[in-house]
Amino acid sequence: TFNNVPTANTAIYIGWYSTGVLFNNDIVVNATSGSGVQFCGGNATASAVLASGQTISIGVNGFSSGILSLRHFTQSGSIPLNLSTTGNSEVRLGPSGNFGGAVTISSPNIYASTSVFNSPVILTKTDGTASNASSGGNTFNADLTVNYFSSTGTGFWSFANGLPDVYNGNVYSNNNSLDRIIFGHNSANNQFNGNFIITQTGSSQGTALTWNNTASS
């Protein structure tokens, strides 16, 4: 269990410079102040593996401050990963992540980069104050559901802002915010190999397939 409750704006850094850190038991994270709990961000070779049958969860104190960063992180096996953060927090999946089980994330801010998701993924962004632009390079091998639910702020939420994403399952885009969801923000050759289903409600500004002039899918 990692509890980050500092009086200064600091974080807990795990496996920061180490290669092949192995976790054979469940990981529990809490962060109510500071900069969160962050894995493997010290250099390009740092990495961590969560053993098959184990998962990551939010503890009883919650995760309301800072970043939960799963960088260079491999989740072995097929146990679902369910994470819900609040406050001004954010969840970062990748870069160089690999997730075997279903991934369900609810957070004010969500980013995904250069990661492979082998089971269904549900991402729910709950705050519209800040724009979230994921850098892309992800492969989604099952269905992806993107929910943007916020009644405040005019921040957009985008994917593939640099590298193309590959979607091998269906994509469900549900927008009930005050701005837009963008797929293929700034990258060429994004691949949609399943159906694309859009739901828009409230005062949302829509869903875009590509955005910048050089982007394509």
Please place each PLM-identified region on the residue numbering.
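Extracellular beta-strand-rich, repetitive "passenger/adhesive" scaffolds
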Residues: 1-139, 143-166, 170-217
